[in-house]
């Protein structure tokens, strides 16, 4: 009997919309990477740093359609990813500027986001960043991103007991398990869209 073929490794580009060092949204993404290493074979989460991207300005594009080096490097990482995990903080009921800037740069010219699966996690006050998730989904329609619908994860970061330590690392085991469920859903959805399962 032949051994079962190994599942391909799905590369998840984790993009945090907050640039703050101790960002709770960054903490969710770090926890996601750890969960994958510990308990989800075939899924690898790689952090994609957006802090070096210039503000979108089409004057920075070259006549032949090129981009500044930091933008080219970012676009390459987006193209190489099989799917995305966004850590989306909420500012003024919407998406944070750094995340919107990254989305815009990778959509210029050839849309690097097109036809790829994605999931969103968020942490914050009030609704835990839930409103930013809905705005990100709206932007994703134009970008042709395919978001998983369930499960949703919007962490009310300031409610007791504490969910994060002073460095922004997730310390809540229940939320860690919920992240695992998001990742398993993203993995299954990605395999389905790629027709690899």
From Swiss-Prot:
It catalyses: a quinone + NADH + H(+) = a quinol + NAD(+); a quinone + NADPH + H(+) = a quinol + NADP(+). Keywords: Flavoprotein, FMN, NAD, NADP, Oxidoreductase. GO terms for molecular function: FMN binding; NADH:ubiquinone reductase (non-electrogenic) activity; NADPH dehydrogenase (quinone) activity. InterPro entries: Flavoprotein-like_sf, FMN_Rdtase-like_dom, NAD(P)H-dep_reductase. Its cofactor is FMN. Its EC number is 1.6.5.2. GO terms for cellular component: cytosol. SUPFAM superfamilies: Flavoproteins. Pfam families: FMN_red. Belongs to the SsuE family. The enzyme apparently serves as a quinone reductase in connection with conjugation reactions of hydroquinones involved in detoxification pathways. This is Probable NADPH:quinone oxidoreductase 1. It comes from Oryza sativa subsp. japonica (Rice).
């Amino acid at each position: 009997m032949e051994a079962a073929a190994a599942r391909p490794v799905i590369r998840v580009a984790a993009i945090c919309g907050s640039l703050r060092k101790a960002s709770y949204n960054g903490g969710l993404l770090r926890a996601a990477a750890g969960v994958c290493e510990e308990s989800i074979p075939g899924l690898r989460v790689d952090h994609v740093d957006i802090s070096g991207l210039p503000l979108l300005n089409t004057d920075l594009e070259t006549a032949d359609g090129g981009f500044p080096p930091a933008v080219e490097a970012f676009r390459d990482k987006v193209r190489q990813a099989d799917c995305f995990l966004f850590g989306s903080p909420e500012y003024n009921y919407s998406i944070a500027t750094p995340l919107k800037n990254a989305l815009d740069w990778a959509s210029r010219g050839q849309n690097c986001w097109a036809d790829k699966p994605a999931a969103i996690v968020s942490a914050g006050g009030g609704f835990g960043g839930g409103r930013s998730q809905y705005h990100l989904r709206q932007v994703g329609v134009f970008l042709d991103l395919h978001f998983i619908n369930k499960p949703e994860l919007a962490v009310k970061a300031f409610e007791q007991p504490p969910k994060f330590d002073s460095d922004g690392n997730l310390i809540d085991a229940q939320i860690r398990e919920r992240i695992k469920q998001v990742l398993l859903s993203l993995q299954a959805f990605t395999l389905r869209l790629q027709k690899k399962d």
